[in-house]
Amino acid sequence: MPRVTISITAPGTPSDGELLTLELPPGSTVKDLKGFIEAETNLPAASQGIYLNGQPVSQETQTLENVGIRDGEMLAVIVRQNRQQPQQPAASRPAPVGQSDPEAVRQQVLRNPQVQAELRQRDPELLAIMNDADRWREAFASRQNSAQNAERERQNQIALLNEDPFNVEAQRKIEDIIRQERVVENLEKAYNENPEVFVRVHMLYINTEVNGVPVKAFVDSGAQATIMSPDCAERCGIMRLMDTRYAGMARGVGTARILGRVHHAEIKIGGAVMPCAFTVMEGKDVDLLFGLDMLKRYKAKIDLEKNALCFESIEVPFLHESEIPRNLDEAEMNEPTVAGPNGTEIGARSGAVRPAGGSAAVEPSTQAGPSAAGPSSASTPAPAPAQTAPAPSAPGPSTASSFPEEHINQLMSMFGVARQEAIQALEIASGNVDEAASVFLG
């Protein structure tokens, strides 16, 4: 007895999106299959289009075996709507009380602080006018009309595409529409049932001292090395100890230039003084990144329950949000966004929800380069020491270069790097193409 699973696409019906499993008698025809589907879902057999592996099954008198439907097959059924159905105005359908009576909804919002909190996240502009009945009524009606128009447009589009059920391109467009609906539904479900995922998570910082200078360190177990910015190294007075033989390029989300390495300096954490090595790197948004190398060396544990970085004998509390440096937050405010429910914006990297217009959306194409790389991009291991002369003091990058084009093109073709990266490698290697290649080999 063949057993098939059927995915039903029937917009505007209770069966839309359902998965139906049927056990069919041996020798059943395609017409019989449609009859079984109609009996289970009340969807007219004449409106059903059956698809196997994306291809329509149209020979109704053939048996399932003859048209290639075997036991365990997955079928798709797309129901063609009555052509007159899209002409039925949406207003003629009964609407829930909340949609037909804006004042009833307003009173519910006024009485229920929990509803106010939800509305503050979903539609802060509407919440701001809840005490003005006239403005509320106008805004509510505007939102209701927009939703009805969007639904009517969607139904009309599906109806037009369904006029030719055997057009592969039309069915692909219907599939895209349905897929996008599922994405929006999934976003709405997360927004309603798991709103915590849209709250910005603040990074973990601790207070430290390096060479007697206070520094707020970002704790990042995803970074392989402990990293310090050149400005911070200057403030702490350890730039003079930097070994430029360890210069190179770090790769992750974008690239960052490694100026060198300080092999030994003292860092004070929670009253304990610990020897530490620092990789000095440009292009980071933090002064000091306390990486996995030091976390493992001192057997540190990130204890989120205690909100502390725990060593064997001390616990160092993570900084409160108000004490965290603002440069990372400013970078997050300029991150790219995607559209969320009710006009909100959701950060593409952080997942944080903001009111519409709450940030300046940055095109993803502008995010390439070291400054766009998040702290975790520092997890790229520092290159091994160069074999010859130390690197010169960090010259400013430039597209125009005095290096031979042949050398630049050679590095670009060998390692698939951008022109600017090839020039930077040649600058580090004082123009020696072989030493520049060792920068990329790490």
UniProtKB/Swiss-Prot annotation:
**Where is it mainly found?**
cytoplasm
Does Metal-binding show up as a keyword for this record? no
Positions of region (Disordered)? 82-102, 333-403
- Where along the chain is the active site annotated? 220
List where Low complexity composition bias occurs.
82-96, 364-402
Keyword list (alphabetical) reads:
Aspartyl protease, Cytoplasm, Hydrolase, Protease, Protein transport, Transport
Sorted alphabetically, the Gene Ontology BP terms of this entry are: protein transport; proteolysis
Annotated Gene Ontology MF terms?
aspartic-type endopeptidase activity
The source's superkingdom equals Eukaryota
Q: What intrachain disulfides are recorded?
A: none
Q: What class of enzyme is it?
A: hydrolase
Q: What family classification does the UniProt entry report for this protein?
A: Belongs to the DDI1 family.
Q: In UniProt terms, what function does this protein have? A: Probable aspartic protease. May be involved in the regulation of exocytosis. Acts as a linker between the 19S proteasome and polyubiquitinated proteins via UBA domain interactions with ubiquitin for their subsequent degradation. Required for S-phase checkpoint control.
Q: How does it assemble?
A: Binds ubiquitin and polyubiquitinated proteins.
Name the UniProt record assigns to this protein: DNA damage-inducible protein 1
Q: What is the originating organism of this protein? A: Phaeosphaeria nodorum (strain SN15 / ATCC MYA-4574 / FGSC 10173)
Q: Gene of origin?
A: DDI1
